[in-house]
UniProtKB/Swiss-Prot annotation:
Top-level taxon: Bacteria
Family: Belongs to the bacterial ribosomal protein bL33 family.
PROSITE patterns: RIBOSOMAL_L33 (PS00582)
Protein name (Swiss-Prot/TrEMBL): Large ribosomal subunit protein bL33
Entry's Gene Ontology BP terms: translation
């Protein structure tokens, strides 16, 4: 089953992306380097739960 997740910026800006993942195939937490428009740089984004 694909669950919705939130990718939160580690720059502390509060910016996030939403996506989904298959927990059976990827049980670990996702980490991506993506663009943060608040600081105008690519920073590390980590997986968090959507509340």
């Amino acid at each position: 089953m694909r669950d919705k997740i939130k990718l939160v910026s580690t720059a502390g800006t509060g910016h996030y992306y939403t996506t989904d993942k298959n927990k059976r195939n990827t049980p670990h937490k996702l980490e991506f380097r993506k663009y943060d428009p608040v600081v105008r740089k690519h920073v590390l984004y980590r997986e968090a739960k959507i509340k």
